[in-house]
UniProtKB/Swiss-Prot annotation:
Gene Ontology BP, a term: ribosomal small subunit biogenesis
Role this protein plays: One of the primary rRNA binding proteins, it binds directly to 16S rRNA where it nucleates assembly of the body of the 30S subunit.
Protein family membership: Belongs to the universal ribosomal protein uS4 family.
GO molecular function terms noted in the UniProt entry: rRNA binding; structural constituent of ribosome
Protein name, as recorded: Small ribosomal subunit protein uS4
Span list, region Disordered: 24-52
Length: 208
């Protein structure tokens, strides 16, 4: 399955929530005046009753789109989350949050996860001093992520840092924006992760 490259607000409207696919800190209903309508020519208003399966599928699609992960990748993350000790849903979110592109975004070096992914693929990011270009690398506690010297003057990185200052940096990450460098202190606890995600619906979907 190819990665979606169409209008970002369309995906957020489909899921009925801000997937944080666009830069900026404006509320979802300000970013798009059609927030309460599904995409499509006739954009039906939300509120109709959905089946249990539909709710589970929508939650999976929502999370997959938030993190920019393809279907097969997401399925593999779920299998890994189910294999290790602990709550499967929480494990899944930890795996997604520990992706290098997500950590780059959380540190404020990219204004969106897509932009952070591009920085990684263009080798503008270093991991423990080495340039890398694989966005899905699992970052571990103590790993140091930094913007490569040759990319430090990029305007988009400076803009992203300004947005991050408004958005806030998670407690499980330590960042020095003056050096464009940060440390992944530990995998986040569930309380540190987005409350609007209902991972239990995803577990129910894959458990069928």
């Amino acid at each position: 399955m190819a990665r979606y490259i169409g209008p970002k607000c369309k995906l957020s409207r489909r899921e009925g929530t801000d997937l944080q696919l666009k830069s900026g800190v404006k509320p979802f209903d300000v970013k798009t005046k059609k927030a309460n309508k599904a995409p499509g020519q006739h954009g039906q208003a939300r509120g109709g009753k959905q089946s249990e399966y539909s709710l589970q599928l929508r939650e999976k699609q929502k999370v997959r789109r938030i993190y920019g992960v393809l279907e097969r990748q997401f399925s593999n993350y779920y299998k890994e989350a189910a294999r290790v000790k602990g709550a499967t849903g929480e494990n899944l979110l930890k795996l997604l949050e520990s992706r290098l592109d997500n950590v780059v975004y959380r540190m404020g070096f990219g204004s969106t996860r897509a932009e952070a992914r591009q920085l990684v693929s263009h080798r503008s990011i270093t991991l423990n001093g080495r340039r890398v270009n694989i966005a899905s690398i699992q970052v571990k506690a103590g790993d140091v992520i930094a913007v490569h010297e040759g990319a430090k003057q990029q305007l988009r990185i400076k803009n992203a840092i300004e947005l991050a200052a408004q958005r806030g940096i998670p407690a499980w990450i330590e960042v020095d924006h003056s050096k464009l460098e940060g440390t992944f202190k530990a995998a986040p606890d569930r309380s540190d992760l987005p409350a609007e995600i209902n991972e239990s619906l995803i577990v129910e979907l894959y458990s069928k």
